[in-house]
Amino acid sequence: MGLCHSKIDKTTRKETGATSTATTTVERQSSGRLRRPRDLYSGGEISEIQQVVGRLVGNGSSEIACLYTQQGKKGTNQDAMLVWENFCSRSDTVLCGVFDGHGPFGHMVSKRVRDMLPFTLSTQLKTTSGTEQSSSKNGLNSAPTCVDEEQWCELQLCEKDEKLFPEMYLPLKRALLKTCQQMDKELKMHPTINCFCSGTTSVTVIKQGKDLVVGNIGDSRAVLATRDQDNALVAVQLTIDLKPDLPSESARIHRCKGRVFALQDEPEVARVWLPNSDSPGLAMARAFGDFCLKDYGLISVPDINYHRLTERDQYIILATDGVWDVLSNKEAVDIVASAPSRDTAARAVVDTAVRAWRLKYPTSKNDDCAVVCLFLEDTSAGGTVEVSETVNHSHEESTESVTITSSKDADKKEEASTETNETVPVWEIKEEKTPESCRIESKKTTLAECISVKDDEEWSALEGLTRVNSLLSIPRFFSGELRSSSWRKWL
């Protein structure tokens, strides 16, 4: 989302650990030079994470996944992505995620969450693998806030009907809830990343055999490509875009004295505002960081859904809103299906999204884009794919199906919901209107032609449209270092 140019030393960006006891003051070495504050996880833990075999964080691919991100036209790329095969040392488990940063330090926040969330989740899974007493010792249900209490009650309701869920789901849900809680605390205590008006979204997918668990914070999105009874490829949205105008989200924000409204020049974009100040105008209801709004209804509690995979399910697309702002779910699914190979599928989606930005928002600079494609079908190829980072192949199993979600706003996904926690997937039939030059199923334009258009070619589109910024302004009581007029370049 927004862009940032920080004076922080580049080595700071590589630090990815908890800092609850790290000193926040600058220490002096005997030589008289200033020394940076120590970070608890800046040493062995981070080196261990970076050396994990099967972990991809940059543009590349493996036998079961591909990743691609492209910087927008406003500076530093604030999107981050992750594929971690053999997660928790399980050959049947894969963790995928995309993270969309915003604000002055958004690029640092998104990378921090990308690096530390899997590490913390792995630790929590080992801790909560026992009985309910172990989760009690972890503090998940001790002295909860009103937000945690709502989520915990929802979890307890799920436990009353365990027949709907496999054995792995509830421990994983507990671990993911606790992980996000700890992740936000770690960001608040970080000595070098100022998260007061900076944050990130997060969409994580954990695939374990036939089971799929999706955790969502913010407005990034996960979409499943599957086949219907006629063997036609359809898109099923696995997450809800957690915007401030959702009824339950808006109600919570108002209870906490925050405000939700849209500006006159962008009436379709609801934003979160401080009670007595027209700032910061955050365009999402949940996020890591953004502590200026945490007392006014913004939360970092993930919306967690469960899905049972079937043999008809083909692949999952995770992407930031730089993609979904200009492409529909069905269009993204069709682009991946039309890609020359699995290795280029994620790049094909990003390239098409960049072209669509030029068409849909000709007066604005395109947003950062990040895409992760996780393929669910088995591959018969024997060798591994050459990539920029070494990865292991984890065998994927074909599966059978039921879709279950605990979200309160499932109607916003246009799903037919029942009184239980079971929902019917959304089969996207209607496609958003897109320019004919970039329509995937156009009679005259192929995918290859669409993504090969020259940059200097003239574009025709609606005039007067502007891109949506995640964050509009910095509160007046923000730290003096960032209150200069130059902050606008970060939005």
From Swiss-Prot:
**SMART domains for this protein:** PP2Cc
User: Which part of the chain is the PPM-type phosphatase domain?
Assistant: 64-376
UniProtKB keywords: Hydrolase, Magnesium, Manganese, Metal-binding, Protein phosphatase
Q: Where does Mn(2+) 1 bind?
A: 100-101
Record-annotated residues binding Mn(2+) 2?
A: 100, 321, 367
Q: Where is the signal peptide?
A: none
Show the ranges annotated as biased composition (Low complexity).
17-28
Task: From the Swiss-Prot or TrEMBL record, give the protein name.
Answer: Probable protein phosphatase 2C 6
Upper lineage is: Eukaryota, Viridiplantae, Streptophyta, Embryophyta, Tracheophyta
